[in-house]
Amino acid sequence: MSKPIVLSGVQPSGELSIGNYLGALRQWQQMQDDYDCQYCVVDLHAVTVRQDPKALHEATLDALAICLAVGVDPKKSTLFVQSHVPEHAQLGWLLNCYTQMGELSRMTQFKDKSARYANDVNVGLFDYPVLMAADILLYGAHQVPVGSDQKQHLELARDIATRFNNIYSPESPIFTVPEPYIPTVNARVMSLQDATKKMSKSDDNRKNVITLLEEPKSIIKKINKAQTDTETPPSIRHDVENKAGIANLMGLYSAATGMSFEEIEAKYKGVEMYGPFKKDVGEAVVAMLEPIQEEYRRIRADRAFMDEVMKQGAEKASARAAETLKKAYEAVGFVARP
């Protein structure tokens, strides 16, 4: 019996954060035995915001090495760089012709990013969700892991797929209509200084973010200064509404140690201050990231190995993507190249 297909991507813009790991990359490693996984470094998406060429080049290789370091196995999964598979851009153009301007103008992420990058509101930024739809539909993905900020984009991909199928092939759909992948454990990491907001790798205030490749001393320093509260006497309990900072630190500690919130609350019952708890959180996070960082450094230094991973990944991805693109081209009446 064939496995359900999953598509997920990571953007090589800025340093990947612990939120990227706990919210996505760790799931990638865990899903490989049960799903037919297509994992992508989405460099085409990255250039919707102006990038320094050298920085983008290095960030793409960094992201690929991190994917491998966290346990993505190229023998089990297809791991590739988006721009190495031209079918993404080709299908993206075709899907543009089946997407309404009004649908894109309602995307909240476009509104947020266009406000942030007001001096460079380009067409690519506006059209980002259509390229994302192409990413998903090319591989017949049954499920797509999405965060709250991407739910709208997945809904659009579903709408485009359904629209195209209904026009050209209602009895034998060309595109699989994807469903969201809901993880069994929701690891949402919040900003260290404002735990009401999601941790973002692009946050200008770097005190809010822990990166995957961050030095241990820096990690511990940031967690020691992370938001808590002024409750007297202090208490360690998971109460997102009233103790967002502590709840966020408990989430990190749970993810790093495997302890449940109940076990953490019992361990720190009757604490007189938050300092010892923060110290333990910092040490646990460092211990979780150290083997990933060591493996990353080993892989990043082996360019020949990385080139082979990229080559094989692109070949596998292109073979599958070309089949879908061929069906879509035939459906709309394009003449096949002799």
UniProtKB/Swiss-Prot annotation:
Q: What does this protein do?
A: Catalyzes the attachment of tryptophan to tRNA(Trp).
Its principal location? cytoplasm
Q: What family is it from?
A: Belongs to the class-I aminoacyl-tRNA synthetase family.
Q: Which superkingdom heads the taxonomic lineage of this protein's source?
A: Bacteria
| Full protein name | Tryptophan--tRNA ligase
Q: Which HAMAP family match?
A: Trp_tRNA_synth_B (MF_00140_B)
Give me the Gene Ontology terms describing cellular component: cytosol
Q: Where, by residue number, is the motif 'HIGH' region? A: 12-20
| Record key words, sorted | Aminoacyl-tRNA synthetase, ATP-binding, Cytoplasm, Ligase, Nucleotide-binding, Protein biosynthesis
Assembly, in brief, is: Homodimer.
| Cross-referenced CDD domains | TrpRS_core (cd00806)
Lineage of the organism: Bacteria, Pseudomonadati, Pseudomonadota, Gammaproteobacteria, Vibrionales
Q: Name one GO biological process term.
A: tryptophanyl-tRNA aminoacylation
Q: Where are the transmembrane segments?
A: none
